[in-house]
Amino acid sequence: ARWCQWYAEEYRFEIEVLTVDPANRSGENVQNWARKVRYNWFKERAEALGAEYVFTAHHMDDRRETFLMNALRGSGLIGITGMNSVEIIRPLAHMDKAAILDYAKAHELPWREDVSNQSLKYTRNKFRNQLAPVLYEVEPRWMGGLKKTIENLERDRDLLLGFMSQWKSEWTETSGEEVLVKM
């Protein structure tokens, strides 16, 4: 956060930093709790500023990690495709982290990575720092293959949700809290 504050001051743009105490998480996993707090705060700030969207820097590597974690938990199509929200825009979601870093280096853009990304205390970091190298050793093309799988499943999810929405509008009607199926 200090580096971000310095950067904002150096380049003269506004920044707001949320400081929270993880002791308030009621035993919930720190990473999950922090994500919920962060996204709730993004939503609150967007509403306060009258913003329709929040942009994040999630990239394809993040999506692969999310996919693998959700798949191993037994998630369904909606859960396994992850990171889907109307309000959140992820312009880098289809780019590999390496490509983003190459771009930053080529254009002399400063880059900082949170030191917690190396800590094996967090499940996501175990995927990133331990499982990913093994997958690369077993199948060097795994990143491209998993990217294609994620994109195919997202397309299937969107198609299925579209069909469900169309069916619902054609074959159901709402009466108070009841949903009635037309015969």
Regions found by a protein language model. Give the residues of each.
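Internal, active-site/partner-interface "lid" segment
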Residues: 117-125, 143-154
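Core alpha/beta nucleotide-donor-binding catalytic domains of modification enzymes
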Residues: 1-133
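Short, structured loop/turn "capping" segments at alpha-beta junctions
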Residues: 110-112, 141-146, 160
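Conserved anion/nucleotide-ligand pocket segment
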Residues: 129-146
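AMP-forming adenylation/ATP pyrophosphatase catalytic core
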Residues: 20-24, 37, 85, 147-183
